[in-house]
């Protein structure tokens, strides 16, 4: 399932309209419509806001979403999503850190798993904080 399909499914299974979710998530109806049609990709803040609106975690929101290579259609790399969802490790990450980590790529390669992402976070935190 693509992220756009997952977003539509979450809304429809609750019997809600686009404007209901958009208002609660503080995004525009056209933007939510574009997300549900796969026309645009959400920011981390939007994913967090939508997850909160649905009463679930970002990890739960991404559950069942297909990943292409190491990136899902419009979301975070799988290993980074796993790190965010980890109750102990993910709690340390602020939205700024998540945005920073999500941009890490060198020659088309990214960290592979939760542990790789966490090690990079620790190294950057030690240097930058």
UniProtKB/Swiss-Prot annotation:
PROSITE patterns named among the record's database cross-references: HTH_CROC1
Membrane spanning stretches: none
PTM info: Cleaved between Leu-106 and Arg-107 by the IrrE metalloprotease after exposure to radiation. Cleavage inactivates DdrOP3, leading to derepression of the target genes.
Superkingdom field: Bacteria
Protein name as catalogued: HTH-type transcriptional regulator DdrOP3
Organism, scientific name: Deinococcus deserti (strain DSM 17065 / CIP 109153 / LMG 22923 / VCD115)
The entry's keywords: DNA-binding, Plasmid, Repressor, Stress response, Transcription, Transcription regulation
SMART domains: HTH_XRE
Ranges of the DNA-binding region feature: 18-37
Nucleotide-binding found in the keyword field: no
One Pfam family of this chain: HTH_3
Coiled coil region boundaries: none
Function: Repressor specific for genes preceded by a radiation/desiccation response motif (RDRM) site, which is present upstream of several radiation-induced genes.
Keyword Flavoprotein: no
A Gene Ontology cellular-component term: cytosol
Residue span(s) of domain HTH cro/C1-type: 7-61
Molecular function in Gene Ontology: DNA binding; DNA-binding transcription factor activity
Cleavage (site feature) positions: 106-107
InterPro entries: Bact_TransReg_Diox (IPR050807), Cro/C1-type_HTH (IPR001387), Lambda_DNA-bd_dom_sf (IPR010982)
Protein's gene: ddrOP3
């Amino acid at each position: 399932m693509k992220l756009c399909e997952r977003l539509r499914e979450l809304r429809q299974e609750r019997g809600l309209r686009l404007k209901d979710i958009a208002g609660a998530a503080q995004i525009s109806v056209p933007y939510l419509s574009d997300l549900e049609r796969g026309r645009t990709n959400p920011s981390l803040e939007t994913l967090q806001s939508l997850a909160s609106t649905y009463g679930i975690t970002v990890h739960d929101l991404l559950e069942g979403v297909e990943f292409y290579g190491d990136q899902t259609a419009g979301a975070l790399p799988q290993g980074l999503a796993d790190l965010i969802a980890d109750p102990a490790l993910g709690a340390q990450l602020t939205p700024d850190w998540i945005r920073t980590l999500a941009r890490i790529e060198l020659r088309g390669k990214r960290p592979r798993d939760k542990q790789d992402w966490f090690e990079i976070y620790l190294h950057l935190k030690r240097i930058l904080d």
